[in-house]
């Protein structure tokens, strides 16, 4: 899969691509990431890519023409058939919030062109003409789209086969369908006792069924406490059995 990133600051991605477990995906080309600076497609001695907004107001707006030239170069480099053009994704506060299901969809695809906006935003005429999808990380504003782009790339990369040390690691992530969309359970490691706090006995029992039941109960408890909407979604989807409901009934008196 291939992601082409349109950014005025490609250097921000250098440590990101070279660090952590997901670097394998980028180093091997399993996730091919290429960078395009719209300044390279701007005209004039100053290579200007932004200008003042019509109507006045603070800040600057990214100009449509350099972005379109940049996008045109990307399309030519990708050599895409008209019916298989990669979607252009722009990160914006008005976009759909990126979640696990969305990441899974991108991870199963062939990639995209990611537009990292800056300043007050992008000329709306370019957005209307070329942007296919708008995504957001949440109800807050960042200085640019680079951090959301990194978040999407990292989330997609770790779902690719062979990237994580344990192929099944992501199957036990929070929100995963394998966990019925619940949050993950607490985790413990050595020593068995730390500052007077012991590891839960179930995890030391060696009894796999008991361990799995404990983990399931903990997932239910954590999710009910922090994201009750996910519990209700699992219930509506028919993913909770009688044992789960019994655990939740006990929790209701404690939360």
From Swiss-Prot:
CDD domains: TrmD-like. Its EC number is 2.1.1.228. One of its GO terms (molecular function) is tRNA (guanine(37)-N1)-methyltransferase activity. Its main location: cytoplasm. The keyword Cytoplasm applies. S-adenosyl-L-methionine binds at residues 117, 137-142. GO terms for biological process: tRNA N1-guanine methylation. This is tRNA (guanine-N(1)-)-methyltransferase. One of its GO terms (cellular component) is cytosol. It comes from Paracidovorax citrulli (strain AAC00-1). It is found in: Cytoplasm. Belongs to the RNA methyltransferase TrmD family. Gene3D superfamilies: 3.40.1280.10, tRNA(m1g37)methyltransferase, domain 2.
């Amino acid at each position: 899969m291939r992601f082409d990133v349109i950014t005025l600051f490609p250097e921000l991605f250098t440590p990101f691509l070279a660090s952590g477990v997901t670097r394998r995906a980028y180093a091997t080309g399993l996730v091919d990431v290429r960078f395009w600076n719209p300044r390279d497609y701007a005209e004039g001695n100053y290579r200007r890519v932004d200008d003042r907004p019509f109507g006045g107001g603070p800040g600057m707006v990214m100009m449509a023409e350099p972005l379109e030239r940049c996008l045109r170069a990307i399309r030519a480099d990708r050599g895409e058939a008209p019916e298989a053009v990669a979607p252009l994704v722009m990160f914006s506060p008005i976009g759909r919030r990126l979640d696990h299901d969305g990441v899974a969809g991108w991870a199963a695809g062939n990639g995209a062109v990611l537009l990292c906006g800056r300043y007050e935003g992008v000329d709306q005429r370019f957005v209307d003409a070329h942007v296919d999808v708008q995504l957001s990380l949440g109800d807050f504003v960042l200085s640019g789209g680079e951090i959301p782009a990194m978040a999407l790339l990292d989330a997609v990369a770790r779902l690719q086969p062979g990237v994580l040390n344990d192929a099944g690691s992501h199957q036990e992530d929070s929100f995963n369908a394998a966990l019925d969309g619940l949050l993950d359970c607490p985790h413990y490691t050595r020593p068995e006792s730390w500052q007077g706090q012991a590891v839960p006995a179930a995890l030391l029992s060696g009894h796999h069924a008991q361990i799995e039941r404990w983990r399931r109960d903990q997932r239910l408890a954590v999710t009910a406490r922090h994201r009750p909407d996910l519990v209700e979604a699992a219930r509506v989807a028919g993913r909770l059995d009688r044992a789960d409901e019994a655990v939740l009934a006990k929790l209701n008196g404690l939360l």
